[in-house]
């Protein structure tokens, strides 16, 4: 944890040195998010908007049942609003804001059904995927209307023209990032902290100053949310928060030609998603071959595998913060060294 704190301080110093103009909106977002969360928690408790914990998860998590959820409504609007004011309501800001809110609404609907039914089954996987793809298609229409280059830039390598293949890739990034953040949101402070650090990385590299500010204000909003979400959490972001953050990350990366940065700096999100896909794929493969499904991991996603291996939540979260900070530093150094 000390290493993670040191890396975080070093990253903050880097940000202040390179982008001093984002310090005020970053701070306002953090403060506003923390204050709004404080006001929201009592209301969510009165409305009995408590988290339902799935029985298949680690048994140690059952004690978290009833913790207020839907916390995404306490920080996403703050980060979006501060960025909107700072950017003068820039059209690209509006597009990413609408994308974020649309995915957040899908998540809110899922959270609401979970609370209403008092089970961990909200939207069916099919309905959820259909809504996610629908939102992604809408954003792709905006990208095409804006004439976004259908290419992929790799620092030190060059620009690869993808043509029509760019659009399936964009859909995959939008839906995949959504689900990756959602899967990562399984421990106190994990998703909020990892995404906060990742947003700083995207903000440092973004060529669009308005979208750079948006990345930093959303990062600040995540930081303010962590006041209530760190171990032991008093508020969960729910799908309301995780799907919204996933949409914001994907939108920022697509508009800034930063898919490489999202993949590299978001390595923790990639690992979490891959761990689930490998676990499910291996289980189904061995079940077909032997009649008995076997598992690669103790439990997926990866953070639960480590937890069941004896790691504490604080150790897992601190390690993932540290890895993300290192990947952000590596991505920034690669981008800077190649002169991109």
Curated annotation (Swiss-Prot):
Reactions catalysed according to its record: UDP-N-acetyl-alpha-D-muramoyl-L-alanyl-gamma-D-glutamyl-meso-2,6-diaminopimeloyl-D-alanyl-D-alanine + di-trans,octa-cis-undecaprenyl phosphate = di-trans,octa-cis-undecaprenyl diphospho-N-acetyl-alpha-D-muramoyl-L-alanyl-D-glutamyl-meso-2,6-diaminopimeloyl-D-alanyl-D-alanine + UMP
GO cellular component, one term: plasma membrane
Locations listed in the record: Cell inner membrane
One protein family per Pfam: MraY_sig1
Entry keyword Nuclease: no
Source species, domain of life: Bacteria
Membrane topology: Multi-pass membrane protein
Recorded metabolic or biological pathway in which this protein acts: Cell wall biogenesis; peptidoglycan biosynthesis
InterPro entries per UniProt: Glycosyl_transferase_4, PNAcMuramoyl-5peptid_Trfase, PNAcMuramoyl-5peptid_Trfase_CS
EC number: 2.7.8.13
GO molecular function terms listed in the Swiss-Prot or TrEMBL record: metal ion binding; phospho-N-acetylmuramoyl-pentapeptide-transferase activity; UDP-N-acetylmuramoyl-L-alanyl-D-glutamyl-meso-2,6-diaminopimelyl-D-alanyl-D-alanine:undecaprenyl-phosphate transferase activity
Keywords assigned by UniProt, alphabetized: Cell cycle, Cell division, Cell inner membrane, Cell membrane, Cell shape, Cell wall biogenesis/degradation, Magnesium, Membrane, Metal-binding, Peptidoglycan synthesis, Transferase, Transmembrane, Transmembrane helix
Family: Belongs to the glycosyltransferase 4 family. MraY subfamily.
Function field: Catalyzes the initial step of the lipid cycle reactions in the biosynthesis of the cell wall peptidoglycan: transfers peptidoglycan precursor phospho-MurNAc-pentapeptide from UDP-MurNAc-pentapeptide onto the lipid carrier undecaprenyl phosphate, yielding undecaprenyl-pyrophosphoryl-MurNAc-pentapeptide, known as lipid I.
Protein name per the record: Phospho-N-acetylmuramoyl-pentapeptide-transferase
Species this chain originates from: Synechococcus sp. (strain JA-2-3B'a(2-13))
